[in-house]
Amino acid sequence: MKSSLLAALTLASCVVPGSVFAEEGATTYRVTFERTWSEDTHPADFPLLAHFSPVIGATHGRDYALFSEGATASAGVERLCEEGKHQPLDAEIRAQIESGRVGALIETMEPIRSVPGSAQTRVSVDAGHPMVSIAAMIAPSPDWCAVAAGVSLMEDGRFVAEKTVELYAWDVGTDAATSYRALDADTKPHVPEMRSRSPYFLRDGASVPVGRVIFVRE
C-alpha cells in the first residue's frame, strides 16, 4: 500500500497544473482556398482574364518555411509565382518530406477563375507537422502570389476545430515589374520575399486581402 501511494504521489508531482499534452497521431482537415480578388475589391488597373493558379502547399513544423518575409525565393517558388506552375516546387516539397521536415504535399489541379471561387482539398497533419503553408499565383502578374504562411492548426497542444486565415498578395522578389501585364524584368540577384506593397493591393495604406483559406477538422 505504501509503495502504491508513493508512486501515485510521485506521478502527481510531475504534472504541472493546467498543462496540456500535445495530441498524438494524425488528423484530417478539409481545406478551402477562396478567391475574393476582383475588380470590386482591387479596382486599380484590374486585368482581363484574372485568375488564381492551382493551389500548392505543405504541412510542416517550425523548422521549415515555404514562404518567409525576408527570405530568398527558391526556384520552385519563383516558377509558381511567375508562371503558376507547380514544378519544381512540388519536387522541392517532396525532398523535404524525405528529410522529415515536411509532412505532406498539398495540391489542387484547376485554376480558380470565378469570383467568388474556391478550390478544395483534404490534408492530414500531425503533432510533428501541425502547420500549413499554402499559395496560388495571382495571374497575370510579374511574381505575385496569394499566400498563407505558417498557419498553425494546433493551439495549446490541441488541434483546432476550425480556422480561417486571410490570404494576402506577396511579392517574391524575382521580377522587378510593377504592373499586372508588364514584360519580364528578372531581378538579379533576387530581393527578399515580402507582402506586396503595390498600390494594387492597398487601400488607405493597408493591405486588402485577396482571399481566405478555411481549415475545418474532420
Label every model-predicted segment.
Residues A8-L9, A177:
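A ubiquitous, low-specificity "background" feature that marks scattered single residues
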Residues M1-A7:
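Bacterial N-terminal signal peptides that target proteins for export
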Residues E24-T28, W37-C145:
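Structured domain cores in non-transmembrane regions
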